[in-house]
Amino acid sequence: MCNCKNKLNDFEKYVICEKGTERAFDNEYWNNKTPGIYFCKCCGVPLFSSEHKYDSGTGWPSFYMPVGEILEAPDLKGGMFRVEVMCANCKGHLGHLFGDGPAPTGLRYCINSVSLTFEPKY
């Protein structure tokens, strides 16, 4: 499933390939307010824009909509139902989707920073 294992360090492999989660408030982009685009760390496709990013108070980067194609799959780990989100291009794990986001979508894409790279908009 994980097509980019060779390019990743051990922690990136854990999150992206093994569907792990990084720590809240201890990740690169949770508080990033710089305008720009977030790309898939594995394959480089654009996934999210800072225009759709908001502070959800969770300690992870949160977006109310993607700009790229995202796959969704049920996630029943830990005895609870969640919706996993993955890059549609490479199938790398990004995070989870929740229904408690702001207007206009009511969605919260809760994303691991380690699954992304960021390019500022100048």
What are these regions (language model features)?
Residues M1-Y122:
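A short Gly-Trp-Pro
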